[in-house]
Regions:
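Charged, low-complexity surface segments at secondary-structure and domain boundaries
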Residues: 9, 133, 199-203
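Divalent metal-dependent catalytic cores for phosphoryl transfer on phosphate-bearing substrates
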Residues: 45-47, 57, 70-184
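Alpha-helical structural motif
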Residues: 20-21, 30-33, 37, 120, ...
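Non-transmembrane, amphipathic alpha-helical segments
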Residues: 50-53, 137, 210
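Acidic/His-rich, divalent-metal-binding segments that scaffold phosphate/diphosphate chemistry
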Residues: 2-100, 110-111
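Long, highly charged amphipathic alpha-helices
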Residues: 64, 107, 213-217
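Terminal helices and disordered tails flanking the catalytic cores of nucleotide-processing hydrolases
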Residues: 153-239
Length: 239
């Protein structure tokens, strides 16, 4: 996991001329309704046999979304909004896996419409609605950060059905990933997903077989940030 500076920690330097975000990660983490959305969504995903999509994933995507924009020089407000969107991006799974990104955006609207400023809410909703590769696109820096953060969370610990990894290629590939790290180089303006894979469990080509669409989306997301996306697996650069 990449860890640089958390919102509000020393090292984050908000621009006094840029208004602060009207809703923060602390606000949504403390909201019992949104907590219910996340826990319920994870139970639905578990029932369908999908990888973990609970609070661990939500908090990690929130943190990395913030860090991506912070490292690349975006405003503290944008980084904070990306953090909120990253935390909430999968709540739509509470209702359905299909079109969960768009469903999630509607749920986010209902939960935040009375406390988030209009522009902030619109930015969060757009990022939530556009984080999946089949229907989404990096429509803003906030959206791009959430995409990169979400797609970088590939890890063995997310797999629930360890006994079926020989049957399901998605579980097998996730189980094979021993370490994932999203490295943001602000000077070179590169965003590199560094994976360590146990090739005894899954071959590198299997990763590309199921994740090619995700990597293409990451490339477009990096371009939205005026950066270049790179992928390394076991130390070898592949994209």
């Amino acid at each position: 996991m990449t860890r640089l500076t958390e919102p509000g920690e020393p090292g984050s330097s908000p621009d006094p001329e840029v208004p602060a975000a009207s809703v923060t990660l602390a606000d949504v983490q403390a909201d019992p309704e949104l907590s219910l959305f996340i826990s319920s969504a994870d139970r639905v995903m578990e029932g369908m046999g999908f990888t973990e999509h609970g609070f661990r994933h939500a908090n990690l995507v929130a943190s990395i979304s913030y860090q991506v924009l912070h490292r690349l020089g975006y405003t503290e407000r944008e980084a904070d909004l990306a953090c909120v969107a990253g935390y909430l991006h999968d709540v739509g799974n509470m209702l359905t896996r299909e079109a969960h990104a768009q469903t999630g955006a509607i749920l986010v609207y209902q939960a935040l419409k009375d406390r988030a400023a209009g522009n902030d809410l619109a930015a969060i909703m757009a990022a939530v609605a556009n984080h999946e590769e089949d229907q989404g696109y990096a429509v803003s820096p906030i959206s791009a950060a959430v995409i990169l953060a979400d797609k970088s969370d590939v890890l063995r610990s997310r797999v629930r059905r360890a006994g079926q990894i020989d049957i399901d290629i998605h579980d097998r590939v996730n189980s094979a990933v021993e370490q994932s790290f999203l490295r943001v180089d602000s000077e070179a303006r590169t965003v590199t997903l560094e994976l360590t894979i146990d090739t005894g469990m899954s071959q590198v080509m299997e990763y590309f077989e199921i994740f090619l669409g995700r990597m293409q989306m990451c490339r477009h997301a990096a371009e939205q940030l005026d950066a270049r996306f790179r992928l390394t697996i076991n130390g070898a650069e592949l994209a």
